[in-house]
């Protein structure tokens, strides 16, 4: 998720 960087880092984009 590019919009949610915090979630992206945890999920791995």
UniProtKB/Swiss-Prot annotation:
Q: Looking at the record's lineage, which domain of life comes first?
A: Eukaryota
Chief localisation class = secreted
**Keyword set, alphabetical order:** Amidation, Neuropeptide, Secreted
Phenylalanine amide: residues bearing it: 13
What is the annotated localization of this protein? Answer: Secreted
Q: Which is one Gene Ontology cellular component term of this protein?
A: extracellular region
For this entry, list what GO says about its biological process: neuropeptide signaling pathway
Tissue/organ expression: Expressed in the brain, frontal ganglion and terminal ganglion (at protein level). Not detected in antennal heart (at protein level).
Can you say what this protein is called? Allatotropin-related peptide
- Tell me the organism: Periplaneta americana
Give the source lineage, highest ranks first.
Answer: Eukaryota, Metazoa, Ecdysozoa, Arthropoda, Hexapoda
